[in-house]
Curated annotation (Swiss-Prot):
HAMAP family: Aden_phosphoribosyltr. This is Adenine phosphoribosyltransferase. Pathway: Purine metabolism; AMP biosynthesis via salvage pathway; AMP from adenine: step 1/1. PROSITE patterns: PUR_PYR_PR_TRANSFER. The gene is apt. NCBIfam families: apt, PRK02304.1-2, PRK02304.1-3, PRK02304.1-5. The lineage of its organism: Bacteria, Bacillati, Bacillota, Bacillota incertae sedis, Caldicellulosiruptorales.
Length: 175
C-alpha cells in the first residue's frame, strides 16, 4: 500500500504558509489505518524496551495499538492540568508562546527503556520535551517512531543521538 497517498494536505492551515498533513483520512480508511499501525509495529519491534510514550493527542492514537500488539505498557504525556495524580512537567516553546507538558510522576521507573510514538515529526521540538520528561524520571529513550516525517523541516537534526524512525517521509511542502 502506498500510505503516502492516503494523507490529505490542507494548505494554509492552521495559518498561512503551512502545509498541514491531515491524518484523519488514514484513520477513517480501515485498511490504511491497519497498515499504519502494522508499519509502526514493524519499525520498533526489534528494539529492547519496556514502555511506549504516547504524546497528546495523536500519539495516543498510534501509541496505544502498538503497545497492545507488542505487549508493552503505555505512558501518556498530557498538557498541563489534564492528569489527575502528581506530575513531572517541562515547559517548551511554541511558535506563539510557551506551553507545559506533564507525565505522572510514577509513570516511568529509573532505568526503564522507552520508545516514543507520535504521528508526525516536524522540527522535533515537542519530542525533545517528551525526552526531557522521560529523562527526568530516570528513563532512557531507546527509539522514537513517527507515522510521518517532514524531512524538509530537518527535525531529525534536532534529535541527533536518538534512534529516529518513520513510516512515511514528505520531502517537500506543497506550498
Amino acid at each position: 500500500m502506498n500510505l503516502k497517498e492516503k494523507f490529505r494536505h490542507v494548505l494554509n492551515f492552521p495559518k498561512e504558509g503551512i502545509d498541514f498533513i491531515d491524518i484523519t483520512t488514514v484513520l477513517q480508511d480501515k485498511d490504511a489505518f491497519k497498515y499504519a499501525i502494522d508499519s509502526l509495529v514493524n519499525l520498533v519491534k526489534d528494539l529492547d524496551f519496556d514502555l511506549i510514550v504516547g504524546p497528546e493527542s495523536r500519539g495516543f492514537i498510534f501509541g496505544a495499538p502498538v503497545a497492545y500488539v507488542l505487549n508493552k505498557g503505555l505512558v501518556l504525556v498530557r498538557k498541563k492540568g489534564k492528569l489527575p495524580y502528581k506530575t513531572v512537567s517541562v515547559e517548551y516553546e511554541l511558535e506563539y508562546g510557551k506551553d507545559i507538558l506533564e507525565m505522572h510522576i510514577d509513570a516511568i521507573q529509573p532505568g526503564q527503556k522507552v520508545v516514543i510514538i507520535d504521528d508526525l515529526l516536524a522540527t522535533g521540538g515537542t519530542t525533545l520535551s517528551n525526552i526531557k520528561l522521560v529523562e527526568k524520571l530516570g528513563g532512557k529513550v531507546v527509539g522514537i517512531a513517527y507515522l510521518v516525517e517532514l524531512t524538509y523541516l530537518n527535525g531529525r537534526e534536532n534529535l541527533k543521538g536518538y534512534d529516529v524512525r518513520s513510516v512515511v517521509q514528505f520531502e517537500s511542502s506543497l506550498i
